Amino acid sequence: MLLIKNGRVVDPKSGLDTQADVLVDGKKVVKIAENIDAGDAQVIDATGLVVAPGLVDIHVHFREPGQTHKEDIHTGALAAAAGGFTTVVMMANTNPTISDKETLKEVLTSAAKENIHIKSVATITKNFDGENITDFKGLLEAGAVGFSDDGIPLTNAGIVKKAMELAKENNTFISLHEEDPDLNGVLGFNENIAKKEFHICGATGVAEYSMIARDVMVAYDTQAHVHIQHLSKAESVKVVEFAQKLGAQVTAEVAPQHFSKTEDLLLSKGANAKMNPPLRLESDRQAVIEGLKSGVISVIATDHAPHHADEKNVADVTKAPSGMTGLETSLSLGLTYLVEAGHLSLTELLKLMTSNPSDLYGFDAGYLAENGPADLVIFADKEKRQVTADFKSKAANSPFVGEELTGSVKYTICDGEIVYQV
């Protein structure tokens, strides 16, 4: 047994926010109360710390199979635990892509060896070809939790419609990366800074919000659920809000980098601040924060995208791959740029990182209650820390290295076992 003493116990799902002890027995939380006496249980003193549900990230890239020089499922799991995450959903843009039952089973077999809960989507189209839809029914039966061609937008609207209809038939949903290549220039650079500082045509706002507009209206027509991944533009928030008010079943996520920073970070951090979609303008940053506050955006997801240092450190920054490692800074970015900045309460932040993403997929996760799963994070919500490149991830491609952030994970507990502690 494990007894967590004297913490601030916060459960966004029930609204619980109180000083209490938490008793864990096996894989379950068995009691939440004051002054629990559990005899010979292992004790964690959580005085001055927050005790919350283990975090849930529905958008990570663990690069296995085929790109394990960047990350693998084991190091990805270590990074997740260090960031306070007990449940993650891997994307399918591996090599080969997770487009068939055999590859999916291989990935899930590897994932099952780890000490956190690792799920996976499968691709919408075979090998990301954008034309031939995968076997949704068979892949779901084999363990896929959903479908996404994340990394590559689906340009064929007819395929999007068919995929939505198929997803609806199978009681699931598709998640979409929205950047129309026909309207975009060089990816990873917002159009403003691309023109001004790099003298290139960059990633445009219209490439994002026009594609979102198309897909949310297809969702409205099909009455299927569509999830919009890592939106970054003010107009995108408005389009999603419009569709939701119209009655379309549309959900959306934002990555921490997009509510924390703007395009200027490219000038100081170079390729480590290059990502798809790119960091945008301050007006966009404020708009996605407003979207989180209003509920239009219901999920914070990292888009954890590790790359090898040699790939990022190329002479021509436009040739560097896009993406940043994100699992180990996500909670701190939320605490720093949303809670400390006065935009959200701690409970509101945690809801976006626990129960909301979990409920999207119907996981038994993201809540802290008696008889519930013993998946917890214990953290100091006001402690300052300097981000270093000493990550559990294989990669250190974070533009936040060197920055002082608020919040520090002290323990992560999954299935009743301590999987990370400082």
Curated annotation (Swiss-Prot):
Top-level lineage group: Bacteria
Main EC class the enzyme belongs to: hydrolase
EC numbers: 3.5.2.3
GO BP of this protein: 'de novo' UMP biosynthetic process; purine nucleobase catabolic process
The protein's required cofactors: Zn(2+)
Assigned protein family: Belongs to the metallo-dependent hydrolases superfamily. DHOase family. Class I DHOase subfamily.
Protein name (Swiss-Prot/TrEMBL): Dihydroorotase
Gene source species: Streptococcus thermophilus (strain ATCC BAA-250 / LMG 18311)
